[in-house]
Structures are given as structure tokens and as C-alpha cells.
């Protein structure tokens, strides 16, 4: 024990702390520089689920808007839907070019305000094509406001976009898309209460010939959160609209099915003994019926008269028989 007694210098070092080692971080303990303040009101929310229904809506909207642009510009555009981006609003806003057409919309009955954003490149492409241009003389972005002519083209495109977006939502959850107003500066939009609030941003890339443009649909996550379960797990078969398409296709295929129509001219009751006595040249008298019933697969479908037309035997339809009602009548107990 005597050999383990500390010297006075060592005791002073323990009491006062070793100035040479006091700044060295202790393993496993975070230093002050690694600690960041946490504000629960501004931290971004983590959305891990894939919004499958929103992807379906975006694809349908792209098809609708493509047809609308074709009717407007008389040129066939190619619209590609980008990946859905879930990001803070300030990240979305800082990447917008100037000038930018910002259109505020409501999706009733959802609470909140969304954005339909047309980039200047898309606006200039639409104006150029609408007035017969082919893109050889691109318009330069100079930070100016849009002209009255450009604004009129924007309004026509926006009307097509809002109609298409409303139709795209009908299959999942019908919403009324309502235009609020337009802005050119993002600071006047205020679709979120904080720059760090999460938004759901979908970019759309438009190609017309060799020219490309872009527009975005940006929705606050708080706006569509009431539909979160529906957007994550879309209904089976995606929509009633697709169910109707399936029915229509089935009806068309059934209508093109080939059936054999059989018309019995007469029935002659004979015994087996009489049939066995028949020989070539025998004559079996029959009575010509006033009407003949035609069958499909044993089910009566129509009554007709028998005759000739242009030298060919033919049937003239007199009355259509409902095969379902006829079958039900036959199945009823007598």
C-alpha cells in the first residue's frame, strides 16, 4: 500500500483537473458542438409510406392534361410524371425560377391551399407554339413579369390543368378544385405556416418537339393528411371508373360473339316403327306454319315469318322474345 501513495503534485492534478486533457471528449459522450436545439413545432415530419393513390392520380392527370394541351396547341406534347417529393416548403420554394407563375388552389372539402406552378420555360413554349412558332427562337428569361398575352395563355393552360386534376381525383376521392388567385413571388403564397412544414411536390416534365418545360403541383402534407390511409392503400381495382371500363369491354366482347340461330320449320311426330318402315320416295306431309320461332342454344329469341327474298330463303323478324323471362316462365311449377 505504501508504494501506491500519490504525490502532492498528482493530488493537485486530480483536484484541479488536468488542463492538458480537459478538452478531450470522453468516448461515448457527445460534445457540446454535436448538440442541436430541438423545436417540435418546426421539425420536419417523416413520411415513410408510399402514396400509391397519389401516384395513380398524377398519372391520370398527366394523360388528361396531355389531351388538353394537344387541343390547345395542336401539337402532341409528351408529359412525364416525376417522382413525388416530400420535402420542407423552403426547399421547394428556393428552387423556383423567376419569373414563375404561382396559382393558389383549394381542394374542397380539404382544408388548406395548394399550388399549381408553371415554369417560365413552359409558358414561353406554349405561347410560341400557339402562335405558330417552332422553338427556333427561344425567349430569354429576364426576371420580368408576364405580358398580357402570356397571362392569357397561362389562364387557358390553368383551366385545362384544374379540370384534369379534378377528374383525376374522382376515382379515389372526389374533390372540387377551386382557383383562388395567382402570384409571381413565392413569399406571397403562404400555403404553410412555417418554412419547415412538409409539402408533397410532384414535378411534371413537358416536351414539345425539342423544347422542354416543367410545372409542379405542390400540396401541404397537412392538407391531404385526412386522406392519408386512402392515399397509402388505394381501393381495389383503383377506381369505379376502371370497373366501368371493364364492364364496357366485356359488353363489347360479348356483342361480337358468334352465335348460331336455329329456326325449326316444322316438327312431325312419328313412332319408331314408322321411321323404320321409311324408304326412298316416301312422302311425309307437313303443314306450313304461320310463324317460326328461332332459337339460340335452345332458348327462343324471336318469332318470324318464312319466305323468299331475292331468290333466297329468309326469315322476317316479327317479335323479339326475352329469353330470360321465357326461361323463368318455363321453370315455374305448373
Swiss-Prot record:
Q: Where in the cell is it found?
A: Cell inner membrane; Bacterial flagellum basal body
Q: Which UniProt keywords apply?
A: Bacterial flagellum, Cell inner membrane, Cell membrane, Chemotaxis, Flagellar rotation, Membrane
A GO cellular component term found in this entry reads:
plasma membrane
Question: Principal place where this protein is found?
Answer: membrane
InterPro entries xref list: CheC-like_sf, Flag_FliM, FliN-like_C, SpoA-like_sf
User: Disulphide bridges in this chain?
Assistant: none
* Signal peptide (from-to): none
Q: Name one GO biological process term.
A: positive chemotaxis
Functional description taken from the UniProt entry: FliM is one of three proteins (FliG, FliN, FliM) that forms the rotor-mounted switch complex (C ring), located at the base of the basal body. This complex interacts with the CheY and CheZ chemotaxis proteins, in addition to contacting components of the motor that determine the direction of flagellar rotation.
The record ties this protein, via NCBIfam families, to:
fliM_switch
- The name of this protein is Flagellar motor switch protein FliM
* Native species: Salmonella typhimurium (strain LT2 / SGSC1412 / ATCC 700720)
Q: Which lineage is the organism of this entry classified under, starting from the top rank?
A: Bacteria, Pseudomonadati, Pseudomonadota, Gammaproteobacteria, Enterobacterales
Gene encoding this polypeptide? fliM
Amino acid at each position: 500500500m505504501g508504494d501506491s501513495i500519490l504525490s502532492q503534485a498528482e493530488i493537485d492534478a486530480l483536484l484541479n483537473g488536468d488542463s492538458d486533457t480537459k478538452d478531450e471528449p470522453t468516448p461515448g459522450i457527445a460534445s457540446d458542438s454535436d448538440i442541436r436545439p430541438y423545436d417540435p413545432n418546426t421539425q420536419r415530419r417523416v413520411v415513410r409510406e408510399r402514396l400509391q393513390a397519389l401516384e395513380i392520380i398524377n398519372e391520370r392527370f398527366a394523360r388528361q392534361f396531355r389531351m388538353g394541351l394537344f387541343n390547345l396547341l395542336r401539337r402532341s406534347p409528351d408529359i412525364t410524371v416525376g417522382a413525388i417529393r416530400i420535402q420542407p416548403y423552403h426547399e421547394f420554394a428556393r428552387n423556383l425560377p423567376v419569373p414563375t407563375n404561382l396559382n393558389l388552389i383549394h381542394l374542397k372539402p380539404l382544408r388548406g391551399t395548394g399550388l399549381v406552378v408553371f415554369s417560365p420555360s413552359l409558358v414561353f413554349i406554349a405561347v410560341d407554339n400557339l402562335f405558330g412558332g417552332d422553338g427556333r427562337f427561344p425567349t430569354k428569361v429576364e426576371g420580368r413579369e408576364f405580358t398580357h398575352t402570356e397571362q392569357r395563355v397561362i389562364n387557358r393552360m390553368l383551366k385545362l390543368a384544374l379540370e384534369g386534376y379534378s377528374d383525376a381525383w374522382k376515382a379515389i376521392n372526389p374533390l372540387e378544385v377551386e382557383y383562388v388567385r395567382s402570384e409571381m413571388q413565392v413569399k406571397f403564397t403562404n400555403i404553410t405556416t412555417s418554412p419547415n412544414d412538409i409539402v408533397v411536390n410532384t414535378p411534371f416534365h413537358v416536351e414539345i418537339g425539342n423544347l422542354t418545360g416543367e410545372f409542379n403541383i405542390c400540396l401541404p402534407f397537412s392538407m391531404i393528411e385526412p386522406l392519408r390511409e386512402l392515399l397509402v392503400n388505394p381501393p381495389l381495382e383503383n377506381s369505379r371508373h376502371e370497373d366501368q371500363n371493364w364492364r364496357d369491354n366485356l359488353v363489347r366482347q360479348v356483342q361480337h360473339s358468334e352465335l348460331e340461330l336455329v329456326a325449326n320449320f316444322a316438327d312431325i311426330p312419328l313412332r319408331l316403327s314408322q321411321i323404320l318402315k321409311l324408304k326412298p320416295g316416301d312422302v311425309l306431309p307437313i303443314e306450313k306454319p304461320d310463324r317460326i320461332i328461332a332459337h339460340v342454344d335452345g332458348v327462343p329469341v324471336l318469332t318470324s315469318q318464312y319466305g323468299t327474298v331475292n331468290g333466297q330463303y329468309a326469315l322476317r323478324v316479327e317479335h323479339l322474345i326475352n329469353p330470360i323471362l321465357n326461361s323463368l316462365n318455363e321453370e315455374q311449377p305448373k
